[in-house]
UniProtKB/Swiss-Prot annotation:
Protein's UniProt name: Disulfide bond formation protein B
Protein topology in the membrane: Multi-pass membrane protein
Cystine pairs: C40-C43, C105-C131
Main location: membrane
InterPro entries, per the entry: DiS_bond_form_DsbB/BdbC (IPR003752), Disulphide_bond_form_DsbB (IPR022920), DsbB (IPR050183), DsbB-like_sf (IPR023380)
UniProt lineage: Bacteria, Pseudomonadati, Pseudomonadota, Gammaproteobacteria, Alteromonadales
Record organism: Idiomarina loihiensis (strain ATCC BAA-735 / DSM 15497 / L2-TR)
One GO location term (cellular component): plasma membrane
Length: 181
């Protein structure tokens, strides 16, 4: 019987999270390289949040048997999802504001001096696009709208998994049961 509370103990669950993040980054690069949609600063920050979730998944994948690495992975997942949600929602709000004058953002990503990612890997982290431009839509939502939905989903799943993991850690039950045979 597989329970949500036991997911952090299973490398396969972390692998699925990593593959999901890899798919999101692959889609971002497809939009950038193939469709020629230039990312803006907020897009790059959202990309970093996805990378943060992916790195947390790698920590969980290789350290799911150890409680410290498992909790570091869960916290990294929750933190990166939350930050990504804030940035994506702010970007979405900026694009849908009535006054286009305020639909601007920084001209270059604000990375730490010790890790200028946009200088080290400009193909991935440079931000020549404008935050207010809506160059792509699907089902009425632009890229920031979809990323808001994705980050909200990742955060919600992360919260549920973490709560179930806490409950299953303090009880003899397996946590929230997904199915019965």
């Amino acid at each position: 019987m597989l329970s949500v509370g036991q997911w952090p103990n299973k490398p396969f669950a972390w692998l699925l999270l990593f593959l999901g993040c890899s798919g999101l980054l692959g889609a971002a690069l497809y939009f950038q390289m193939v469709l020629n949609l230039e990312p803006c600063v907020k897009c790059v920050y959202q990309r970093m949040a996805v990378i943060g979730i992916g790195l947390s998944a790698i920590v969980g994948l290789f350290g799911s048997g150890l409680w410290l690495t498992r909790w570091a992975a869960l916290i990294g997942w929750l933190y990166s999802s939350y930050q990504g949600l804030l940035i994506a929602y702010d970007h979405w709000d900026l694009q849908t504001s009535k006054n286009a004058f305020f639909a601007v953002c920084e001209s270059a990503p604000n990375f730490p001096d010790w890790a200028p990612m946009h200088e080290w890997m400009p193909g991935l982290f440079a931000a020549p696009g404008l935050c207010g431009d809506i160059d792509w839509q699907w089902l009425g939502l632009g890229m920031p709208g979809w990323m808001t939905v994705i980050f909200a989903g990742l955060l919600l799943i992360g919260i549920i998994v973490t709560i179930c993991h806490i409950i299953s850690s303090f009880t003899k039950k397996d946590g929230l049961v997904l199915y019965h045979k």
